[in-house]
């Protein structure tokens, strides 16, 4: 797909896009992504492990320093950082051995959360390099902002499609990113698929390898 084709796919968020003509996968349209959440999900609880040592939680979980320390959390990503949201910050956890990362985001379809996809994912991935670490990603309810950042992490660092990532997290927690965030995850899915296609096309084919050895 050309860059022009990629832009068309981004503009029409309700149409499936196939980046790799040789593959079977198509990035779903926005409505199809929403349908993935209609399959049902686990009963809502304050915090859930959705990937080894990676948890999604809500404001109540983030404010309970005693339980966080007892559970062994070492890293906290607040996807609702700020005075009008979940107002914690590194000073709130200063008596704990916790590394804090704040993202000032509003749970609005018009908010560009994608600007934080890579920095938040890098924070999570760096933390999980040590298997002793435990990461909590939270917002107010633990369903939209925090879930979106975790989905982006799984897509960027674990090579998952947006469908794979949603299915992985939904098995463990009831999440529901707003429609604007889903569109941004869809754009990320197209971007990553294009990168994978370009990487695959840049590798020498078996025919090329055979011709050089003859």
Curated annotation (Swiss-Prot):
Family label: Belongs to the protein-tyrosine phosphatase family. Non-receptor class dual specificity subfamily.
Chain's role: Dual specificity phosphatase able to dephosphorylate phosphotyrosine, phosphoserine and phosphothreonine residues within the same substrate, with a preference for phosphotyrosine as a substrate. Involved in the modulation of AMPK and MAPK1/2 signaling pathways.
Keyword Cytoplasm recorded: yes
Domain of life where this protein originates: Eukaryota
Catalytically driven reaction(s): O-phospho-L-tyrosyl-[protein] + H2O = L-tyrosyl-[protein] + phosphate; O-phospho-L-seryl-[protein] + H2O = L-seryl-[protein] + phosphate; O-phospho-L-threonyl-[protein] + H2O = L-threonyl-[protein] + phosphate
Top EC class of this enzyme: hydrolase
Protein name: Dual specificity phosphatase 29
Active site per the UniProt annotation: 139
Annotated source species: Gallus gallus
Gene Ontology MF term list: MAP kinase phosphatase activity; protein serine/threonine phosphatase activity; protein tyrosine phosphatase activity; protein tyrosine/serine/threonine phosphatase activity
GO cellular component: cytoplasm; nucleus
Entry EC number(s): 3.1.3.16, 3.1.3.48
Positions of the Tyrosine-protein phosphatase domain: 46-194
